Amino acid sequence: HYWFDLNRDWLPVQLPESKARVKTYTDWLPNIVTDHHEMGTNSTFFFQPGIPSRVNPLIPNLNQKLTEKVAKYHANYLDKIGSLYYSKEDYDDFYFGKGSTYPDANGGIGILFEQGSSRGHIQNSQNGVLTFPFTIRNQLTTTLSTLKAASELRIELLSYMNDFYVNNFNDSRKSKFKGIGFGNNHDNTSSYELASILKAHKIKVIETDGKKFKYFVPLQQKKSKLIKAMFDTQTKFEDSLFYDVS
């Protein structure tokens, strides 16, 4: 894909797969999204929450608490099959262009899974021989634990999503900032492309007369949190480190 990681493309939606994926996501608006990946062979199995000090400030605290509740199901299921695992290390919840973080700006719970890779059928590791069937078993097991968590926590998850959108809409209505204007008649192409990206996320974009700006994005709409995630400039951080967002 021209050296561009599909799992950084959830916000810019430049590749065909990303456009289809974001459209499907927006149509369904899931309560939980699982994002399955592989990591270095000598690692075991990771599931979120990630490093607590590296959570994007726009993500509600309740999101992380629900992620921890779901994590207990993963731990329980992996304990039953004797698989090693860890959490709250290595990975974070900061960049919204990843599959495990994009849901956090849309009222859902995004969960990253990272499995130590067998790099094919079988590989020696610091933890012993690692086989491809073993890695698949861990990924499948945490898929089933997620389904169990979604079923048993459904009331909390549904309430969270409802409150997420109600609170964001009310905050936008009370805010002195009513929207974001961008573009002009001297830069039609880039302005059009940015507007197209926003529309791909089902964000309302109004085309103006172009005297001051070409497009206007009102904050008082369903996707207000996602708009802030895309346009806000965050300059204060609890941690100085971040997982790769390139």
Which residues fall in each region the model found?
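Acidic active-site catalytic centers that drive phospho-/nucleotidyl reactions
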Residues: 5, 35, 114
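Short glycine-enriched loops at secondary-structure junctions
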Residues: 38-40, 116-117
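Active-site environment of divalent metal-dependent phosphoester hydrolases
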Residues: 39-43, 189
